[in-house]
């Protein structure tokens, strides 16, 4: 069997710029629907529909526009956050560039400076995480050590831990308040939170002899890969953690 992956990134960019409530997003989805129809018609002209399984989903949703309501929602000033956390660590441990970067809800500390001063990295991470919780717009702040050494079996902690990758994630991982997004030029909406508007997306499997039906229950996105492997009659990916969706077991 062959597997073709297509990523369509325009919806994210348009939603970020204009907001999910906008006529621009509505127009974009209308055009996207037409383009998908053209693609499927072309595909089915080459291959019989029963020989093709189409999976349509998204890796995330997006937040409501910060200025869509009568009162504007708070926005998170990442540059200011980085400066203030650095100032806090300077006050605690002396001058220096303690914070080297903040990107996509991840705060990165200066490990070289911490080690040169003979300080404990875990302690500094925990200090920064505790202080970050006082910042306006921050809902959760967890240290890298907590992510690696603790088990969060439910709630937002579990979602943050599932998104954590030790080689790339920051020393402190931040989750913002519901509806709060990072302040950026020309950005009205943003993805990357742990809330339902961001984590609930449609999942459509079509073709390949799959009977037509609507399933109302929630499923985990980690089930997509093993379900596809099952339908293609090939081994599951080695790092796969999900289970085959019961609706597709023969």
Give residue ranges: language-model regions:
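Active-site His/acidic residue clusters
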Residues: 1-32, 38, 69-70
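Structural motif
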Residues: 3-7, 55, 173, 204
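Short connector loops/turns at beta-strand edges and beta->alpha or beta->beta junctions
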Residues: 9-14, 179, 200, 206-210
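Extracytoplasmic/secreted cell-surface and envelope-processing proteins
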Residues: 14-17, 63-67, 117, 183-185, ...
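Secreted, luminal/periplasmic, and some membrane-associated catalytic domains
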Residues: 23, 34-180
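Soluble non-cytosolic domains of exported or imported proteins
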Residues: 23-30, 34, 118-123, 215-222, ...
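Substrate-binding rim/cap in mid-to-C-terminal beta-strand-loop elements of soluble/periplasmic
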Residues: 79-122, 190-232, 246-250
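Short, His- and charge-rich active-site/binding loops that engage polyanionic ligands
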Residues: 172, 176, 180-192, 196
């Amino acid at each position: 069997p062959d597997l073709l992956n297509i990523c369509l990134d325009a919806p994210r960019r348009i939603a970020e710029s204009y907001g999910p409530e906008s006529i621009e997003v509505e127009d974009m989805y209308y055009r996207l629907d037409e383009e998908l129809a053209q693609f499927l018609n072309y595909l089915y002209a080459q291959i019989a529909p029963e020989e093709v399984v189409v999976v349509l989903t998204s890796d995330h949703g997006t937040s409501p526009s910060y200025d869509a309501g009568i009162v504007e929602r708070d926005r998170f000033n990442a540059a200011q956050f980085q400066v203030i956390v650095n100032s806090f660590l300077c006050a605690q441990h002396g001058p220096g560039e303690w914070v080297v970067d903040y990107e996509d809800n991840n705060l990165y500390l200066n490990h070289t400076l911490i080690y040169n001063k003979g300080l404990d990295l875990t302690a500094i991470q925990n200090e920064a995480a505790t202080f970050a919780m006082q910042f306006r717009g921050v809902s959760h702040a967890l240290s890298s050590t907590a992510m690696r050494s603790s088990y969060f079996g439910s709630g937002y902690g579990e979602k943050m831990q599932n998104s954590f990758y030790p080689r790339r994630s920051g020393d402190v991982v931040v989750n913002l308040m519901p509806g709060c997004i990072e302040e950026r030029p020309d950005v009205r909406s943003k993805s990357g939170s742990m809330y339902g508007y961001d984590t609930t997306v449609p999942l459509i499997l079509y073709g390949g002899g799959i009977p037509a039906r609507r399933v109302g229950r929630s499923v985990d996105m980690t089930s997509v890969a093993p379900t596809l492997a099952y339908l293609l009659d090939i081994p599951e990916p080695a790092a796969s953690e999900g289970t085959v969706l019961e609706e597709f077991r023969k």
